[in-house]
Amino acid sequence: MKEVSPTGRVLGIDLARFVAIVGMMAAHLLAPRSGAGPYSIGWLTALTSGLPSALFAVVGGFGVYFSSRRYLAHDQRAAAVVSLLMRGAVVMIVGFALELLPDHPIAVVLVFFGLAIACCAPLVLLPTWILVPIAMGLPFLGTVGGYGLSQVLVAKTPQASSSIREAVSALFFTGYYPAVTWVAYLLVGFVAARFLFDEGQARPLAPRALLLAATGAIAFGAGRLISALAMPSAVEYLCQTYGVGTDRAQQYIAAYHRGVPLVPPPLSFALAAPHSGSPADVLVSSGVAVAVTGLLVAAFSRATSVPRVLAPFAWTGAAPLTIYSLHVALTAATWSATDAGASGGAGTWWYQSEFWGQMIIILVVGTGIGLSGKRGPLEALTSSAAQQAARRFTADP
């Protein structure tokens, strides 16, 4: 198989990023047709409900690891923290900029993602044995806080908030992608990256990656089992509380919950409703993310260069911030130009076909970035800002 020259990147991680981006694109452009008569693709809604964004966040934890390990290897702890704080700030700024686009149906993840990166900045100084219980405990905190605050605060984004209190609540607990949950995802990825890439590991990379994938699969299975056991009680609660039938209650649970559990704790702890951020949901979604990432790293663990046939996908995945922002901008442009929101465009075949058009565009852009030998423009901006911020804390920038 023909190959392109090595880049020093981890091929499996770039491919995992690509899978995450395509999954989110499918959630935004293909899944809205789920249940739409003869074009029904309900299975796709189930597949893309929360899983691609979780993969995006977990692989983001790998990015936190890669961007901080050089500083930490030289005991430049302050530089590592400041660098990540700046990265998080830049990502948040990009996210706020995307919120200024014309109306569109996408809940932009970048404001929450950037905040989560900033929150992780001091945590990278901690040993793994402390990070693991933190990652495990955050979904419990998020579920309790999110459910409690959702009873009095309704804002899902800081932009939609009517007060500072609502904005803070949306960012950390009640938003579409609350930071408390995304910090947990980032820590899962960060710990996984330590397991795979820290020096001194006894086993080769491929066996470690396969063990990681197996761990993710076990986590997924455990989460689904726990949720299945909790489902009858959750359905009964919804039926009694809202006066709905069993089928409608199950539909409520299967729908998007955007960071807020549908039933109160402690029952919500065990219910893996998509986007709820519950412990069971995080166990299921992060399990899938870890399994996918582990398998891709294992499959290409011996690659010293990028196979030519995979180069467009790897190059596109290597610029996730740029490509994701491009996807949001393209979708907003279509939504605005066609007045899709008013005309129900998300349920039409032509809106679904935009997925394939955007796929071509992002692959062309990603290939162009790869052939240039440079980073994506937003990746370069983020990296430059982080390095400049860290420079004053180290003599070796």
Regions from the PLM with identified roles:
Residues 1-397:
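Alpha-helical transmembrane segments and their immediate juxtamembrane cytosolic regions
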